[in-house]
From Swiss-Prot:
<comment type="pathway">
    <text>Aromatic compound metabolism; 3-chlorocatechol degradation.</text>
</comment>
<dbReference type="GO" id="GO:0018506">
    <property type="term" value="F:maleylacetate reductase activity"/>
</dbReference>
<dbReference type="GO" id="GO:0009056">
    <property type="term" value="P:catabolic process"/>
</dbReference>
<dbReference type="InterPro" id="IPR034786">
    <property type="entry name" value="MAR"/>
</dbReference>
<keyword id="KW-0520">NAD</keyword>
<dbReference type="GO" id="GO:0004022">
    <property type="term" value="F:alcohol dehydrogenase (NAD+) activity"/>
</dbReference>
<keyword id="KW-0058">Aromatic hydrocarbons catabolism</keyword>
<comment type="similarity">
    <text>Belongs to the iron-containing alcohol dehydrogenase family.</text>
</comment>
<keyword id="KW-0560">Oxidoreductase</keyword>
<dbReference type="InterPro" id="IPR056798">
    <property type="entry name" value="ADH_Fe_C"/>
</dbReference>
<keyword id="KW-0614">Plasmid</keyword>
<dbReference type="Pfam" id="PF00465">
    <property type="entry name" value="Fe-ADH"/>
</dbReference>
<dbReference type="InterPro" id="IPR039697">
    <property type="entry name" value="Alcohol_dehydrogenase_Fe"/>
</dbReference>
<dbReference type="GO" id="GO:0046872">
    <property type="term" value="F:metal ion binding"/>
</dbReference>
<dbReference type="Pfam" id="PF25137">
    <property type="entry name" value="ADH_Fe_C"/>
</dbReference>
<dbReference type="InterPro" id="IPR001670">
    <property type="entry name" value="ADH_Fe/GldA"/>
</dbReference>
<protein>
    <recommendedName>
        <fullName>Maleylacetate reductase</fullName>
        <ecNumber>1.3.1.32</ecNumber>
    </recommendedName>
</protein>
Length: 352
């Protein structure tokens, strides 16, 4: 056994009523002029969350949107500078926290993240920005939030359809972490626990969307899964999803949900150790099929065509995904990759 374990993580405050810690976290970080970021849809929630610290808010910006368009990032950074903000409070999911990361990258302001989905961006130093139909990603320690407040009550109003796909998106982070070249024994344990907790939570949320315990378990699983991704390299699954999202503007979590079973099936024979862990975590002898059925049986999409992709886009997406080399356990083959995309486009069960 050989590994180098260099764990990177923000400070985490977790549990019901943990939002009460927001004033203390701002004080700890010396933030007294915060820029509050949300999407347009979550602007009212953002103001509600920020109300107890309104005296320490310099400005609100509610323009966050999927895949962090460059123009949106420029606007948010301009507001951060003109308002003389000395910190960022990001209230929302991957779109909002992703925008906060670009603001932090360009201004070096500290982030306090308050997630309202299970996307997990808050636990990584990964950032992305989209310009000219291309989503560029990278890693930088400056974009890692300084504190993350996981308040399960904030997810109770998250629509069920988004809850399921967001949770499967979280699972995708841990799945790829299991076969990353820089995986470690501790990250493997975290991935197994995170996947198992999230799968249990999905079934319970689907039956009872306002089950606070299930919502808490989903956040717990998302925290673990994202923590894994924050400490490993990304492979085929994430590359495909970033390409589909940045090029075709497909919805982030739904795209992860559709692609994950197929990307795992593509790599399955090359990662026997990861497959053993997944069989335990998923309680199923065939992990790709288990993930496909998890989505299908809980009302989530299983076909890229249902997300707005056109069949004629398949070859273009495949070629883009092959342009940049990245670590993947199985060699990338154009014909096999296009077959994967066709299966995902039509919503067929995954095949190796």
């Amino acid at each position: 056994m050989n590994f180098i374990h260099d764990y990177r993580s923000p400070r985490v405050i977790f549990g019901p009523d943990s939002l009460a810690r927001l004033p203390q976290e701002l004080e700890r970080l010396g933030i007294d002029r915060a820029l509050v970021l949300t999407t347009p849809e979550q602007a009212p929630l953002g103001r509600q969350v920020a109300e107890p610290v309104i005296g320490h808010v310099a400005a609100f910006y509610d323009g966050a949107t999927m895949h962090v368009p460059a123009l949106v990032a420029e606007e948010a950074c301009k507001i951060a500078r003109t308002s003389e903000a000395n910190g960022v409070i990001a209230i929302g999911g991957g779109s909002t926290i992703g925008l906060a990361k670009i603001v932090a990258l360009r201004t070096e302001l500290p982030i306090v993240a308050v997630p309202t989905t299970y996307a997990g961006s808050e636990m990584t130093s990964i950032f992305g920005i989209t310009e000219g139909g291309v989503k560029k990603t990278g890693r930088d320690a400056r974009v890692m939030p300084r504190a993350v407040i996981y308040e399960p009550r904030l997810t109770l109003e998250l629509p069920l359809s988004i809850s399921v796909t967001s949770a499967i998106n979280a699972i995708a982070h841990a799945v790829e972490g299991l076969y990353a070249p820089d995986a470690t024994p501790l990250l493997t344990i975290m991935a197994q626990e995170g996947i198992a907790a999230t799968v249990r939570a999905i079934s319970r949320m689907y039956q009872s969307p306002r089950d606070l315990q299930a919502r808490g378990d989903a956040l717990y699983g998302a925290w673990l899964c994202a923590s894994v991704l924050g400490n490993v390299s990304m492979a085929l699954h994430h590359k495909l999803c970033h390409t589909l999202g940045g090029t075709l503007d497909l919805p982030h979590a739904q795209t992860h949900t559709v692609v994950l079973p197929h990307a795992l099936a593509y790599n399955a024979r090359a990662v026997p150790d990861a497959m053993r862990v997944l069989r335990i975590a998923l309680g199923h002898d065939d992990p790709p099929t288990a993930l496909y059925e998890l989505a299908r049986d809980n009302g989530a999409p299983v076909a890229l065509r249902d997300l707005g992709m056109r069949e004629e886009d398949i070859e273009h997406v495949g070629d883009l995904a092959l342009q940049d080399r990245y670590p993947n356990p199985r060699e990338l083959d154009r014909d096999a990759l296009l077959a994967l995309l066709r299966d995902a486009y039509h919503g067929r069960p995954p095949s190796a």
